[in-house]
């Protein structure tokens, strides 16, 4: 129960992150905005990492998995998602990329030998359905847009599965800080140099970093307490919360699609709390 709540709270934090982006830093590219957000989050994580670092030993295998995890999540995954958005509308890119919980549940049986839970699998599918209900509008885009969205989902799924391995060997703060630091280095090559010195509202940059820190900390802790395939579903509901917060804070229209999507998300979360289906 606790890990489900932590994962759900992480999704809420990431949704607020999106609202902060749309409210205060949307005048720069997504790459530069992510660079600023990651920079602040890395700085925020530094004291926690320094506190937990004494006595920590990172062997070669763990270091390699850390690098792979950061590249899959923040570089290959995010870049593929942005490539998808360039080639197809949000109504295609977002639902397709939201299939990553399904991959996590299925791949966990191969990578970790986990038992396939019907509750977890159906819950993951329901999350995808909810995102599709809200954002899917039947618009058409390039086939490559769909491919990049699915590639992003697959990359994110693999990155999430590495967290089970990493949290067994390292404190949560170290895992989060090192991954963010590696991400920051990678983003420094893709952020637009002429935008790095652009005057953006400092408040919104710092707020995005705070929400990123809270979301990552809660999600990785949830994985450490349980396992990725049991907690990934609530964390992937951030697009639904983003739509809700958009209606509340940005005065966006509340549609029947949004209400229906919320109902499906509630079913998905309840399914994780029910006894296992046979």
Swiss-Prot record:
It is a multi-pass membrane protein. InterPro entries: EamA_dom. It is found in: Cell membrane. It holds the Pfam family EamA. The chain crosses the membrane at residues 1-21, 30-50, 56-76, 92-112, 116-136, 146-166, 170-190, 209-229, 230-250, 258-278. This is Uncharacterized transporter AF_1533. GO terms for cellular component: plasma membrane. The keyword Chloroplast does not apply. Belongs to the EamA transporter family. Residues 12-136, 154-274 form the EamA domain. Keywords: Cell membrane, Membrane, Repeat, Transmembrane, Transmembrane helix, Transport.
């Amino acid at each position: 129960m606790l890990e489900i709540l932590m994962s759900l709270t992480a999704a809420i934090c990431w949704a607020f992150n999106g609202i902060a982006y749309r409210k205060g830093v949307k005048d720069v590219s997504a790459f530069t905005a992510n660079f600023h957000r990651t920079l602040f989050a890395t700085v925020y994580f530094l004291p926690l990492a320094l506190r937990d670092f004494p006595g920590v030993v990172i062997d070669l295998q763990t270091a390699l998995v850390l690098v792979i995890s950061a590249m899959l999540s923040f570089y290959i995954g995010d870049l593929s998602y942005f490539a998808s958005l360039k080639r197809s509308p949000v109504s295609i890119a977002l639902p397709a990329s939201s299939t990553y919980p399904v991959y996590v549940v299925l791949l966990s049986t191969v990578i970790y030998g986990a038992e396939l839970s019907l509750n977890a699998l159906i819950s993951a599918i329901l999350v995808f359905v909810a995102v599709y209900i809200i954002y899917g509008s039947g618009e058409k885009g390039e086939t490559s847009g769909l491919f990049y969205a699915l590639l992003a989902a697959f990359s994110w799924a693999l990155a999430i599965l590495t967290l089970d391995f990493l949290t067994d060997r390292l404190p949560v703060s170290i895992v989060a800080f090192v991954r963010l630091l590696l991400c920051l280095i990678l983003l420094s090559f893709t952020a637009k140099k002429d935008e790095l010195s652009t005057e953006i509202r400092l408040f919104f940059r710092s707020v995005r970093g705070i929400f990123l820190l809270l979301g990552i900390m809660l999600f990785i802790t949830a994985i450490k307490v349980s396992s990725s395939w049991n907690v990934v579903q609530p964390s992937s509901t951030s697009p639904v919360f983003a739509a809700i917060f958009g209606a509340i804070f940005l005065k966006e229209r509340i549609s029947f699609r949004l209400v229906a999507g919320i109902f499906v998300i509630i079913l998905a979360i309840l399914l994780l709390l029910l006894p296992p289906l046979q």
